[in-house]
Amino acid sequence: IQMESGDTPDFALWPQPGAVVDAATRGYLTPLEDLGIDLDQYQNDFSSYLVGLGVVDGVIYGGANAANLKSIVWYQPAEFDARGYSVPATWDEMIALADQIVADGMNPFCFGMYSNGASGWLATDWMEDIMLRTGDGVDSYDKWVTNELKFSDPIVKNAATLLSQIMHTEDYVVGGTDAIVSTYFGNAQDPM
């Protein structure tokens, strides 16, 4: 909204690369080269994939300032050993293990999506991770973040269905599914 009003900031950070593409396409961004950035050095310092996240029509407008994995499934090895659980290698094995953990009287997942006015970005992280693993890998993911692959595409729908399978199964989540949006993301791991 700020950019659309003509009040473009000198510097902007976005959590998703698709926003860079959108802002550049609308003419809101200045190419890094025009800012005096040594593009050869920049491309030397970062992987081609990370550089590519800020490229629109062959022009570099920005790049990744961080790479975070936030949708990793963490577990307690000692607890698994004590209960005889094996680390799952596939989605189906993870669901079978989740069912076993529920049968044993526990909740296998703890999610926290509350983040004040920014709630929702955590689900996006999970969705992105599932997209990378279930679609056509990086190709479908890249098309999705640039809006070439629509949310109505079967690849995206499949990822959403898989995410829903773990987030919307009441007994899978500590506090039930309603607790997902009321648990602050920084406290989500507390039950572990």
Q: Can you annotate each of these PLM segments?
A:
Residues 1-20, 186:
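Early extracytoplasmic/lumenal segment of secretory-pathway proteins
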Residues 56-65, 71, 95-149:
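Extracytoplasmic/periplasmic solute-binding protein
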Residues 15-71, 95, 101, 122:
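Hinge/lid segment of periplasmic solute-binding proteins
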Residues 78-88:
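Aromatic-glycine-rich donor-binding/catalytic loop that engages nucleotide-sugar donors
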Residues 16-19, 28, 76, 90-97, ...:
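Stable alpha-helical elements in mature extracytoplasmic
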Residues 98, 145-185:
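Glycine-centered hinge/linker elements that transmit conformational signals in sensory
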Residues 30-46, 86, 113, 132-158:
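Short, solvent-exposed loop/beta-turn-alpha elements that line the ligand-binding surface or hinge
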